[in-house]
Amino acid sequence: MKPSGLTFAFLVVFMMAIMYNSVQVTADADADAEAEALANALAEAGILDWGKKVMDWIKDKMGK
């Protein structure tokens, strides 16, 4: 029994969907790791606290 062209096309699309999904999951995990590393670096450098102080100073100067 010879598979039809439609069966072959379905298998190709199915394999492409599986490959795309696996690449997307890896990209999301990498992005999450990068975001966490950036947040940790900013927290360790004290930049977040500095930014809060600047915003408080601006609010005081604007009278809000």
Swiss-Prot record:
The keyword Mitochondrion does not apply. Its main location: secreted. The modification Methionine amide is found at residue 62. Belongs to the formicidae venom precursor-01 superfamily. Truncated sequences of this peptide have also been found in the venom. It is possible they have been cleaved in the venom. Antimicrobial peptide with activities against E.coli (MIC=1.3 uM), S.aureus (MIC=3.1 uM), and S.cerevisiae (MIC=50 uM). Also shows histamine-releasing activity (32.9% at 10 uM). Does not show hemolytic activity, even at 50 uM. It is a short peptide for which no alpha-helical region has been predicted. GO terms for biological process: defense response to bacterium. Residues 1-27 form the signal peptide. It is found in: Secreted. This is U-poneritoxin(01)-Om1a. Expressed by the venom gland. GO terms for cellular component: extracellular region. Residues 28-45 form a propeptide. Keywords: Amidation, Antibiotic, Antimicrobial, Secreted, Signal.
